[in-house]
């Protein structure tokens, strides 16, 4: 049965189904730190998550055979699992206690000051920037974030301070709870970076997504904060629909303004120079503005925030240089939506203005591979001299999409001598693309 059991007073045996995902693996980290005995099942276990779970002493069980399901006080069921899964059916038939990952996390952080970072783009980067600022001030912030940063050992930790930062996405919680994950977090500060249509596998249209954000806004207390950038009509429609918390429109009445041309942030009566920051592109600097203002609301001086971010190590797969030699550069980026692809392409063109750039875009998300973005998707990378579109799903949308990495590599091999920068964009395992390309470059 669905349980409301919290871990405030009990030390439990907890089994996580779907433990190898970033969220559930991060949840395992926090549960172990809280003193629980944790085990987990998944289809397969692979680094780096398998290494992280092993270091925590988590028993890992491959597959979902009913016979391999261990006894536990509580089962946490991941949103990738559905009815028909042997373990799920056994748990239901035996009326065992179960819950979702987001609900479990929400119960564990209920007594913390929660900063939830939501939106279609920039969640991971903004979350880590906030954590870097807090950590630089000696604040042992807790967090669970769906990415990897060299600034932190893991993508999750409990932390000892009052603050907890959570990457709050709008995907559903579990097969038995189709509400968005962020509805469970009850944030004190709710950041909405932007809202666009995505996740076509669970949302019919943009209004479906806006409804979930509206529900989340209704959970923010009257003394809480809702932060968003000026100019996003979708967010403004939500605020106008009903909001009971303090709102902060960055770039608007909050007197915090990003000037890309000047390379500065104007914050009230201060002028903050961004020239020494390691981030590239307006979208990343927007994340900086959001992180700095969030930190300001929680008592951190903007100059201290800026100083902390000058030492930022960034987030893996966010315009990350994965290879560089005398004449070739390979960049890996997580972009998987027309807006994100457009921003990443613009950043690459500005950063490598005199060099020939080609792009490889994998249509890996359901929304992309099923053609929901239409021509916007292909237009988003039109600034590049050449784009290779990789679609490994069974549904091809265009004749120029490659359904084989080997075929793509064969064509790239013909052009490689005339290429300076290769920009890979995918939200799946990009190493299957980057590693053979790097090998190709080395062997030329």
Q: Which residues fall in each region the model found?
A:
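A conserved, hydrophobic alpha-helical segment in the catalytic core
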Residues: 183-197, 236-237, 278-314
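Short pre-catalytic strand/loop immediately N-terminal to key active-site residues, enriched for Gly-Thr
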Residues: 274-281, 328-332
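Short, polar loop motifs at secondary-structure junctions
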Residues: 43-46, 64-66, 79-83, 103, ...
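Phosphate-binding loop of NTP-binding sites
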Residues: 5-11, 30-36, 67-70, 83-228, ...
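Redox-cofactor binding/interface segments in oxidoreductases and associated redox assembly factors
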Residues: 75-78, 166-167, 192, 228, ...
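ATP-dependent carboxylate-amine ligase
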Residues: 1-45, 54-61, 71, 75, ...
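Short glycine-rich anion-binding loops that position phosphate/pyrophosphate groups of nucleotides
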Residues: 80-82, 122, 170-173, 196-198, ...
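Beta-strand->loop->alpha-helix junctions that form or flank phosphate-binding loops
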Residues: 61-64, 99-106, 144-147, 242-261, ...
